[in-house]
Amino acid sequence: ERWKELLLQAGVDKAEVMPSKGNPMVYAERMVDPKAKTVLVYGHYDVMPAEPFELWKTEPFEPVIKDGHIWARGADDDKGQSFMQAKAFEYLNKHNLLKHNMKFIFEGEEEIGSGSLGPFIEEHKDLLKCDVILVSDTGIISPDVPSITTGLRGLSYWQIEVTGPDHDLHSGTFGGAVANPINVLCKLIADVTGPDGKIRIPGFYDDVEEASDEERKLVASIPFNEEEYKKSIGVKALFGEEGYSTIERTGYRPSFDVCGIWGGYTGDGAKTVIPSKAYAKISSRLVPHQDHNKISQLVVDYFNRVAPDTVTVKVEKHHGGYGYVCPIDFPAYKAAERGFETVFGKRPLPVRIGGSIPIISTFEKLLGAKSVLMGFGLESNAIHSPNENMPVDLWLKGIETIINFHLEYDKEA
C-alpha cells in the first residue's frame, strides 16, 4: 500500500495492489500516448532478513541518514533503488518531459526466487506489455568508474539432509563405530570443489561458454585492485577456478558454495553426541546457457551416487533461475550509456556481475522485451549484510541518471 501511495503521489494515472499466488504485486502506469513506446520499471519491495541484529549500528528497519549515507535494510537492495525510479518519474512527469508511456511492477518475492511473478506475468501479458524493461537492482564499479550490468548469473539452490542413526548417540559408547553425519556431510561437500577451483560434478560445465578474447580484454581493462578487494572483505588470499581473474570468476564462470551448515549440539558448553542428522544449504551461481533445472538434477544425482551406505542422503531442490546477457547495441542500452555519461562525465563500462535476478530472463521470454540493468549500488553498501547503506550523493546521481535515460530514450524511440 505504501508503494501504491508513493507512485500515485509521483503522478501515475493509476496504481493498484494486485493479488498473486504469493505476496501481492504493485502495478502502476502513466499513459502519455497509446502510440508511444512503453518503458516498464521493475523492482522489489522485499528484503533479506536483517539478522544478526547485534551487528547493526542502527535499527535496520528505521532508516537513518548519517555520515552522508542512508542506513537501513533495503537502502540499496532494492527499496532505495526502486525509489530512485519513482522519483525520476516524478520529476519527468512534473516538468512535462515524459514523451513515452511508463509502467511499474514491484514484487515481494525477489529474494526467494520470484516464484509468483512468472505466473503473474503470464496472466497479465497485455497489462505489462512494453518495449523495454528498466531495472535498478545492480551496481556500478565505483562512483568514479560508472558501469552498466550486461550479464547476470543464474541460480540453483538446494538443502541437503544427511541421516545416520535414528537418534543422537553417546560419542563414547558409539564413537569410532558409527559414521557421523556431520563428518560425512563435510566430506561430501568439500569433495565437490577441487584444489584447482574446478567443480567436479560430471556434466556441470557442459553448457558453459568460454569468454571470447574480446570479452577477456574488456574485463582486463576494468579497474580492479586485488589488494583493496581483499582488504575490503577481510581475507588474506583469494581462491577460485585456476586460469581466470577474479572478475572473470564472478561474472563469467559458475560457482558452488555452502551457504549454511548445521547439526548436532551447538549450545553453550559441551555435549558429547554423535548427531542423528546434519544439514547444509548450498547455492550455485550459473552462467548464461546453463539450465538451472538440469544443474539442479545433476547435483541431486551426484550426491545420491557418491553418498556412502553408512548414511541416507536427501537432496531437496529449492528455487532457481536462468542467467541473462544484455545486448549493448539496442536503443535503450545506448540511452542508458548517454544517461550515465551526462551525469558521471564518463562512458560506463559494460560488465557482467555475479549476482542473479531470475525474473529478467522470464520477462524476455514472456513479454519479448529486453532489460536494461541500470543499478547504482556499491560493494561497500553491504547488501544482504548488517549495516546496509546507500550514499546520499550517489542516490541523487542515480535519480539524475535515470531522468537522463528517459530523455535519451525519447530521442532513440
Stretches found by the model and what they are:
Residues 119, 175-196:
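A short core secondary-structure module
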Residues 69-70, 76-151, 413:
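Acidic/histidine-rich catalytic neighborhood of metal-dependent amide-processing enzymes
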Residues 147-163, 374-377:
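Flexible glycine/proline-rich, aromatic-decorated loop/lid segments
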Residues 1-53, 277, 281, 293-295:
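N-terminal helical capping/dimerization or prosegment-like subdomains
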